[in-house]
Amino acid sequence: MAKKMLFLFVLLLSLTGMLKAQVTTAGMSGKVVADEEAVIGATVVAVHEPSGTSYGTVTNIDGRFSLQGMRSGGPYKVTVSYVGYQTAIYTGIQLQLGETYSLNVTLHEASELLGEITITASKSKFSAEKTGATTNISSEQLTTLPSINRSISDFTRISPYASGNSFGGRDGRSNTFTVDGANLNNNFGLSSGLPGGGNPISLDAIDEVQVVIAPYDVRQANFIGAGINAITKSGTNAYRGSAYMYFNNEVMRGNKIGDTDFGVRAEESKTVYGATFGGPIIKDKLFFFANVEYEKSPQQVITWRAAKEGETPNNSTISRTTEADLAEFSQILKDKYRYNTGSFTDFPADVTNLKLLGRIDWNINQGNKLSVRYNFTNNKTWEAPNGSSGNTGYRLAYNRVSAYSMSYANSCYSLQNIVNSATAELNSRFSSNVSNQLLFTYSDMKDERGTNSSPFPFIDIMAGYYENGNQILEPYMTAGYELFTYNNLVKNTVMTIVDNFTYYLGAHKLTAGISYERQKAGNSYMRNGTGYYRYSSFEDFKNGAAPESFALAYGYNGNTKPSADVKFGQLGVYLQDEWNIRDNFKLTAGIRMDNLSFLNDIMRNQAIYDLDFNGMHIDTGAWPDSKLQFSPRVGFTWDVFNDKTLKVRGGSGFFTGRIPLVFFTNMPTNSGMIQNLVSITTRYKDGVVTSRDPRLELLKGNMITDVNQMISTLGLPTSISPEEGVLPSSVVGIDPDFKMPQVWKTSLALDYQLPVSFPLTVTLEGMFSKDINAVRQYNYNVQAPDKDTWSRFNGPDDRYIYPENFLQHTNISSANVLTNTSKGWGWTGNITVMAEPAKNVNIMAAYTHTESKEISGMPGSDANSAWTNVPSINGPNSSGLMRSQYVTPNRVVASINWRVHLNKKTSSNFSLFYSGYSSSGYSFMYSNDMNGNGVTNDLIYIPKTKDEIKFTSTEDADAFWKFVNQDPYLKK
């Protein structure tokens, strides 16, 4: 039945197009009356005065009007006219992104002396008809509030629910961030920052930002933390431009906290250059806006240098590696293999960031407005070669660039963050009762490693041998294509198409919408992808001796750049009714249905599938089944006295979000079916060889530099099938019934404008959330504690002791499966005060208390780390509710802005922002594996009395109780 209803709904909406659901515009609605009766057919025209953009309609049978798809900001001039009545003109109206401005109009009969009346809009904070927890950050605030990092988070912190990238105690990766409706989110989730190095778009190109925590508008979706919607600036009828420069260095920041001085500061600086320009192409009709910004931070990636002839190495800047050896090594590689190592004295270093943006706005006619925007970001940093890691059984004793070893410029690597994004939006009004929004967006985001090196094996030269002939396990020289850089790429492409169709029926505003989002994400990681050689000494290398170790990663079936990919499409269908039950009471009710389907095939590893976990199997060749998830929502706003001085608002509803896509690609990455990892090595004990892989002898003589020749020489497999799969050391899977995270949020708020001589408003808001489908990892390979056969500790701490055979299968270490839990809840309470005690002086202060409980915060980006890093008593599989790792229990924010007009054309702003908070939760854990389950995440037992636990000495007991008594929580 549900499928039939969905089909009919999709069929109905297919007449209007398709769309996704993050807001890009504002709106205006109201009622026109005269002599306490509704005025039918009154003309309402709103003009965005800076651009001359006009929006018009007429009132319906109930005297109501609604204008949608309007530019946010202003000022607007609204004219309301009707034959036989004075024309009412409202000026100075400002619209907020994503909100509908409420304008109720009373017309009076015309007289010969007065043909029209002009009214200047008051600065009520409650003119918008929002229902849930929302914060709007205006263009003025973006210009005046202090910003050190020039990042979006410098402004979203204004939201009382914010704590860095986290909102309401949720993982920052559960947010969604859009610009003009385009997804510029941290979808993959390897790090906590946004694409483009954390700032995918210049602040000087942004016009307004909206932060929504619990919006009861069903058009907003794909988050359980916060939805952050930004819109870019547009051109107007006036040519306006700006040029700017920002500079800071180590002298311009503090270096002392309390009594702690951090000593001499290393040199650092950052300079940002930028410009904006916009204006009319055709007055009142066609506009443009452009922005360019370039950032540069001089860096010194490598501070070590090689020792000159006769020079003594030191522990600060001069390495023991000599210039003569580096020069000889480089020349050999050039002469014998035609490989250029790059300089060993001049290394790439600078951090650069380039941002470009262009936007066109076209007022086709009064009923159709089109906007098109494109932006590009390229952030680039340089790093020294990896310190000491390898894939041959042990790490090097010291870093590859250090007092003991040196490398070359072409062995450094860059981290490059590239963003390309485009949007096209058409807002149409077909009649006074019918309007439509059609939006198309495209975003391509890449985080990739780069290098100046040509493809070539990575080579470690070790320091040789001791006098007794034992190997010195220390690096001496390094050259080649950095071992973790080849085909190291995270890519994410997002395309959305959305359509919102709105029909006005009396006191009802009906919205039907459909959205489709198609995402592709891939994680490519091939350490040793060009081959890896490690030689015991420089002499061994020069003499063509067999390498001490060798490693290689290559793709099966001729794929030179394999990737663990996930592709999915999400169809969203929604219906909403905004019902003005009375002039001062509006009820919003809607339902949203989202269906996510995976679109790419992956190969099963039959060896993994054959493992039996108490009747359950892990299929690494199948994505979760398609799931239809429902998100019903209801919200209301009540203007108690019908004068916008006291509003009560709130609502309740379901919100469906996403998880970092890396937790999906973890499965194919760890299945062993994408690429082959080969390690051929020599093993030691105390420097003495204990074993040596005989295949190393095949690599004597000149190095093999071609990957295909390496594969053929060593007789490695070039293809794979499900039946040829072998068991990896750890297994990663996804529950076939897995659902995207879903939470139920309920909020209630009161907005009050105090009756004083200046604007002074107070907001009280509370919100409760309950997890419907939270996310966790569950290790299938760990047996559940058995109260009948497992032992326990004696005493008050009677946790289980894991037996030696607690693993289901001893030939794998873990089998972590991504699954759901319904456990988890949270609540927040907030009070916000806003005031304008004097002209051009604005003050804001807010206090928020947050509590949030969860089973797992899914820390990191790896399935195993997400499981092992959950504090527990009887093991991560048995973990209970705990305070969220992302929660900030108490937070105070305040800001003050004072604008001083120096003359008619010049003014100065003085702004101050304050943020104070109590630290987030932490846990006390034993340093060892207390219960024997192989994981060092065991919570300590806090005794109630001094007699409950024993100590080996009186000194230990005194130290323990001294520590307990100084902590307010522990001593309870």
Indicate where each model-derived feature is located.
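Periplasmic N-terminal accessory/gating domains of Gram-negative outer-membrane beta-barrel systems
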Residues: 60, 86, 91-104, 115-234, ...
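Outer-membrane beta-barrel translocator/receptor signature
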Residues: 203-210, 218-227, 233-327, 350-356, ...
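Solvent-exposed loop/turn elements at secondary-structure boundaries
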Residues: 602-631, 636-817
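Extracytoplasmic gating/loop element in the C-terminal half of outer-membrane beta-barrel translocons
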Residues: 714-720, 907-972
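Periplasm-facing N-terminal accessory domains of Gram-negative outer-membrane beta-barrel systems
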Residues: 19-124
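Gram-negative outer-membrane beta-barrel transporters
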Residues: 763-919
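Transmembrane beta-barrel strands of outer-membrane/channel proteins
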Residues: 121, 243-249, 290-294, 372-376, ...
